[in-house]
Amino acid sequence: MEEIKIGVVGLGYVGLPLARLFATKYAVVGFDLKKERIEALNRGIDRTLEVSEEVMKSVLRPSVPKRGEKGLYCSCDPEDLRDCNYYIITVPTPVDKHNRPDLTPLIRASETVGQVIVRGDIVIYESTVYPGATEEDCIPVIERVSGLKYNVDFFAGYSPERINPGDKQHTVEKIKKVTSGSTPGVAEKVNALYHSVIVAGTHLAPSIRVAEAAKVCLLYT
């Protein structure tokens, strides 16, 4: 059986609750560029108030957990991500004054993952994007940085985040997740990963593009 280790890139209101949830079952490394944020999180303090100090401390580990272990270690050092075999990117996608999406955070997060990814790894995007962005804008960045080939050496998934910040009733595990993967086998793996922690269940979309479109539809309904 595959031993799973997850790297969550971006520890904001989406990434942190997700990292905390996965850490109840798996080894998780939470990565964020903000050093002050990482230092606070490793003391159990989430200034966004999405995760309580008690809950944070219940999953925190003093060092990077190994595959097969459980728990969360937060870091701003990309090297701490190196042993992960699943990467979940949860960085924001702001819009400019013309309401066009700014993919800069996603591109930078993809570069970070590209530095540490190895053959067989799976990269899952949760950030809100337009249909096609994952495979047309983000994946080529990973290929360029890593030297690996998409759907040959590494694979991808998309599962749109649906967290409502500040909502203590509809927390991440209580919201049904749409999942997808770049091949049928990878799609099943991605779906199984989320299904193992999401009590509300999952829905496996037929493709990454369909899953991306599902999030766009949710924004306008």
What is the meaning of each model-derived region?
Residues 15-16:
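N-terminal Rossmann-fold NAD(P) dinucleotide-binding loop
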Residues 220-221:
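Conserved small/polar residues in nucleotide/adenosyl-binding loops
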Residues 22:
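Aromatic pocket-lining residues of Rossmann-like dinucleotide-binding sites
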Residues 2-4, 27, 33-86, 92-100, ...:
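Conserved N-terminal Rossmann-fold NAD(P) cofactor-binding segment
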Residues 95-162:
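Rossmann-like NAD(P)(H) cofactor-binding subdomain of soluble oxidoreductases
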Residues 89, 155, 162-205:
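Dinucleotide-binding Rossmann-like beta1-alpha1 core, especially the glycine-rich loop
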Residues 11:
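Glycine-rich Rossmann-fold phosphate-binding loop(s) that bind the pyrophosphate
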